[in-house]
UniProtKB/Swiss-Prot annotation:
NCBIfam families the UniProt entry points to: rplS_bact (TIGR01024)
One family name in Pfam for this protein: Ribosomal_L19
Keyword terms of this UniProt record: Ribonucleoprotein, Ribosomal protein
The keyword Ribonucleoprotein appears for this protein: yes
Top-level taxonomy: Bacteria, Pseudomonadati, Pseudomonadota, Alphaproteobacteria, Acetobacterales
Originating organism: Granulibacter bethesdensis (strain ATCC BAA-1260 / CGDNIH1)
Protein's recorded name: Large ribosomal subunit protein bL19
A GO term for molecular function: structural constituent of ribosome
InterPro entries, sorted: Ribosomal_bL19, Ribosomal_bL19_CS, Ribosomal_bL19_sf, Translation_prot_SH3-like_sf
Function in brief: This protein is located at the 30S-50S ribosomal subunit interface and may play a role in the structure and function of the aminoacyl-tRNA binding site.
Family, as annotated: Belongs to the bacterial ribosomal protein bL19 family.
Length: 129
């Protein structure tokens, strides 16, 4: 590992210790709580939608969330380790077979729905024990 990769690994470890990042993949519905500064006040704003893409590039990793707001599609790209993100919550797990879900841009209504991933029984029984 060269010095740049070592430095990036240390930075990622530091950032994850400050704010843990949940495991999520494209197709999952996420709620991202973003810190918004208005004058002197700071508040958190929720942005909930389907993760349509994720780019794993070390410290520069990002993910794209798409939601429908008042009939218009809204997409937002979030840097994964950004200090403006207060929290990332996984609302539901989606069952998709693609890494990039850009085809959802051309769909609306029922055709844009994503099936929920069935829960595995092995993890539930292991958690019960």
């Amino acid at each position: 590992m060269n010095i740049i990769q070592t430095f990036e690994a240390e930075q990622i470890a530091r950032l994850v210790s400050e704010r843990p990042v949940p495991e999520f993949v494209p197709g999952d519905t996420l709620r991202v709580l973003v810190k918004v500064v208005e004058g002197e006040r700071t508040r958190t704003q929720a942005f909930e939608g389907v993760c349509i893409a994720r780019s794993n590039r070390g410290v520069n990793s990002n993910f794209t969330i798409r939601k429908i707001s008042y009939g218009e599609g809204v997409e937002r790209v979030f840097p994964l380790y950004s200090p403006t993100i207060a929290e990332i919550q996984v609302v539901r797990r989606g069952d998709v077979r693609r890494a990039k879900l850009y085809y959802l841009r051309g769909r609306s209504g029922k055709s844009a729905r994503i099936a929920e991933k069935a829960r595995s029984t092995t993890t539930e029984t292991a958690a019960a024990e």
